Every structure is written in C-alpha cells, then in structure tokens.
Amino acid sequence: MAEQDVENELLDYDEDEEPQAPQESTPAPPKKDVKGSYVSIHSSGFRDFLLKPELLRAIVDCGFEHPSEVQHECIPQAILGMDVLCQAKSGMGKTAVFVLATLQQIEPVNGQVSVLVMCHTRELAFQISKEYERFSKYMPSVKVSVFFGGLSIKKDEDVLKKNCPHVVVGTPGRILALVRSRSLNLRNVKHFVLDECDKMLEQLDMRRDVQEIFRLTPHEKQCMMFSATLSKEIRPVCRKFMQDPMEVFVDDETKLTLHGLQQYYVKLKDSEKNRKLFDLLDVLEFNQVVIFVKSVQRCMALAQLLVEQNFPAIAIHRGMAQEERLSRYQQFKDFQRRILVATNLFGRGMDIERVNIVFNYDMPEDSDTYLHRVARAGRFGTKGLAVTFVSDENDAKILNDVQDRFEVNVAELPEEIDISTYIEQSR
C-alpha cells in the first residue's frame, strides 16, 4: 500500500517554499534568460519548427497559430533530443513543449514504452494524457496510457500486458508500483519528463521514488523538466538528472504575474463573502469561473448554495472518489457547467481554456498557491480577472507577500470594471 500513501500525499499542496531570490548567477551552459516585456505571441509559426505533418494538422485543429514564448525558446532544442530545464509562468504552454517534442521524435515499437512523463497529482496526469491524445490525433500508431493511484492497479497491469503504450503518463507512486510488480518495463525509455518538477523533488519521499524510477531507465535518454516555480535550491537537484541541459527561465522569477490578468481584492467580513460573491457573479461577464475555498466542507456548502441561487455550479474536492473528480473535471472542461468550486487540489497545472475569472473566496495559504490559483484565468496570454477576498489580518499579510514577491500591485476592486480588460471581445 506504499504507493497509495504517496498518492494521497500528492493531493494536497503544502506550498512551504521560501520566497525565491532572484535567479542565481551560477554558469550552466547553455542558458537562456528571456527577460523584458511579456510577449506571449511570436511572429514565427509552428511550421518553422519543421514538425511532422501529422503534428501540424493536430496543432491547427487545436486552434494554435503561433508558439508562445516558452515554446519558441524550447521546442527547437527539445526536438533535437537536448535535455531541457524550463521555468515559465503558468498558462504559457509548457505542456505542449514536451508533448510536441516527444511526439516529433517518437518511433513507436510494439511492446515498448518510449516516453515516460510524471507529475505530482492524478488530475494533472489525466490532463497531460489528454494533451498527448489531442496532439497524436493523426498518429494512430502511437498509444498513450495514464496510470495513477485511486483506481484499480489490476486494470493498469492488464493494459500494460495486452496493449502496451508507447507513451506512459503517471504519478510516481503508481509508476513505481507497476515497475515493482514487473508490469511496466522502462528499459527502452528514450524520453523522461517531469512536469511541475519542483513539487516532486522537494518532497523527499517522492524524490526517492522519482530517483528509483530514473535509475531503471537507460543512461542514454532525453530528460526534460518543467515548472512555474523553480527555487534556486531545487535547480541543482534538477540538474543531477541531466547532461548539460538547456536552461530556459522565461522572465525574472520574481515577476510571475500573468500578462492580461487583472488582479483585485475585496475587504470584507467572512460572513459577507456569500452576498458579495453572488453580487459579483450577477454583474461580471464570464465564460467560466473557478472559486477557490480552503476546505471540503466549505466547497460542498458553497456549491450547494450557488445551485440554490440558480448559478450553474459544480464542486471538485479531495473528499470525492477519483472517478467522480475526473468526471466533474471533464464536465466543466466540456462547458456543461460554468462555475466550479474547488479546493487547492484543483489549483495547480489544471488547464481550462474558457476560464476568465478566478475568485479566492478564501485566501490561499501563501504566495505560491496564489500564483497557481489565479493562473487558471488568463491562460496562454488571454485576458482574465482574479478577485481575492480579504477578511482578516493574516489574509492581508499574505496579499502583501504576493505583492512584494511578484512585484505586482493588487488594487481594491473598483465599483465598475471595464469588461474589455478581462474578457476577450469577439471580433
């Protein structure tokens, strides 16, 4: 049951990092620091990367025309098999870097796993596997599977035995359990990827799992690691897995604000939050909204209250069975519901393209969690709005930490907000 314990740990985000110092100056060639103004769209197109026609067709189907800054910097080297260590803001398309780079290079061999991608939560693993399916749409010979705790390991073992995937996405606990049961063979892995790598490498037990898995893969392979937050303490740990990696840090790490995202706070008592939330949902224009709360109980109660007030809400929290969480996540992603109430479980790495407003109904516990929550709105260079409720001195302190660390001014919510500042106008 050891892997179950690891999996359960993955569900909560204990964001206890120290505020990050500006980027270290230790030389580690080749390194790219992409600073200056935040330009999310480059004039070059995906065609410039000379990708397979099947990939280009899938990219067109997804509606992407130009690579983001991080894609522009990473993809040309990544598709050549170079090791990559990349830190870039949430919502800038890091996932597509390793999905496209690995699919570009993959030469599927029946019965062999070529690509191993690991991340720290089940939901993120599920989402990454969906991205692989989306981009490999015109590559029918490429098989993708996702493995994580909370679901029957027997089913996973059957999949590996009867229909061995070329791309495996999963959480470290379940991957290690499958390796130990001799169901998963990693001897042919050519690409080893960690997404939100800091989350896995900061927790010592999870780092041990990752290291054990890493040692079971061939010495000659490509290693890529990505995260929105990479403290200077964790970077040397990442480098130990790599050989002369290309390091890409998009923008200064203290300035992890998101282009196009309007950020405001509202000062009020805890007892006034519901009324204020309902008022704002009435007056603001939104495609989809995520409301973050601090506990399962508050999540369930608020979702119920919203439904009673005729707001189409759905809840996701860590008290739910795994299948139920994934089903609800998919419902929200498919636009069946427009309002999602969630705990931190949902806060990191989740990608819902239509979300343009995030509410911190309860203040996140620290500045990192704040970043990963508000990054749900305004992803991939689009506009968005983040509203944070401040109800006591501790809330105010955390908001000050956010402003100091990310060098951003979070102003008090004005009486009226120009709709064009937080929602894309249809052309």
From Swiss-Prot:
ATP binds at A88, K89, S90, G91, M92, G93, K94, T95. Its EC number is 3.6.4.13. GO terms for biological process: mRNA export from nucleus; mRNA splicing, via spliceosome; negative regulation of innate immune response; negative regulation of RNA export from nucleus. Residues 1-36 are annotated as: Disordered. The modification N-acetylalanine is found at A2. Residues 260-421 form the Helicase C-terminal domain. The modification N6-acetyllysine is found at K35. It comes from the Eukaryota. It catalyses: ATP + H2O = ADP + phosphate + H(+). Keywords: Acetylation, ATP-binding, Cytoplasm, Helicase, Hydrolase, Isopeptide bond, mRNA processing, mRNA splicing, Nucleotide-binding, Nucleus, Phosphoprotein, Ubl conjugation. Binds ALYREF/THOC4 and DDX39B/BAT1. Interacts with the apo-AREX complex component SARNP. Interacts with MX1. Interacts with MCM3AP isoform GANP. Interacts with ECD. Interacts with PHAX; this interaction stimulates PHAX RNA binding activity. Belongs to the DEAD box helicase family. DECD subfamily. PANTHER family: ATP-DEPENDENT RNA HELICASE DBP3 (PTHR47958). This is ATP-dependent RNA helicase DDX39A. The lineage of its organism: Eukaryota, Metazoa, Chordata, Craniata, Vertebrata. The gene is Ddx39a.
